[in-house]
Amino acid sequence: MGQKVHPTGFRLGTTKTWDTRWFADRNYADLLLEDIKIRAWLKKRLAHASVSKIVIERPAQKARINIHTARPGIIIGKKGGDIEKLKNDIKAITSSEVQINIVEIRKPEADAQLVAENVAQQLERRVAFRRSMKRAVTSAMRLGAEGIRINCAGRLGGAEIARTEWYREGRVPLHTLRADIDYGFAEAHTTYGIIGVKVWVYKGMLIEKK
């Protein structure tokens, strides 16, 4: 059976970049563990804020955290009160000085991670998986995606035997390195078990053919 390589890992260093951007010598492991803790804590804390990705940079004893979200108002709060509280809570995890930047996602319907989380939430609310997949695909294509593929795997519809169902519209060239492929994964925790949702969104070519 053909296995799918992670589209972001496959393109690192060519058309994609890392979500953790810093260099370290001896304390590399400590900083990496800090990053993992910060990411896990933020994902839990901002579960309802439509967070797509968290990019961490560390310039000179600082930790600059860029949160990519579709709902910046929820994170910032009234007069920036919530973001200050967030900053103080993160200071308990890291020894560095914390700076938080909020990056707004203009088209959440075409962001692979947010689409995957949206489909997973619908599956948890017992919406029919085919309907939620179809709705997500239609929305992404309407907002300018050139192609999208959604995979749902698990006990779909409460079936005894787990299976994989997928739906695709447009083209999704996974082997073309210059193709801008956005990938997202989420889990739906249903009463029957966990359903995995994978989303690939093709947004066009980054480098045109010479």
From Swiss-Prot:
Positions of the KH type-2 domain: 38-106
Gene3D superfamilies: 3.30.300.20, Ribosomal protein S3, C-terminal domain
Keywords: Ribonucleoprotein, Ribosomal protein, RNA-binding, rRNA-binding
Domain of life where this protein originates: Bacteria
Keyword RNA-binding: yes
Coiled-coil segments on the chain, per record: none
SMART domains hit by this protein: KH
SUPFAM superfamilies xref list: Prokaryotic type KH domain (KH-domain type II), Ribosomal protein S3 C-terminal domain
The protein's name: Small ribosomal subunit protein uS3
Source organism phylogeny: Bacteria, Pseudomonadati, Pseudomonadota, Alphaproteobacteria, Magnetococcales
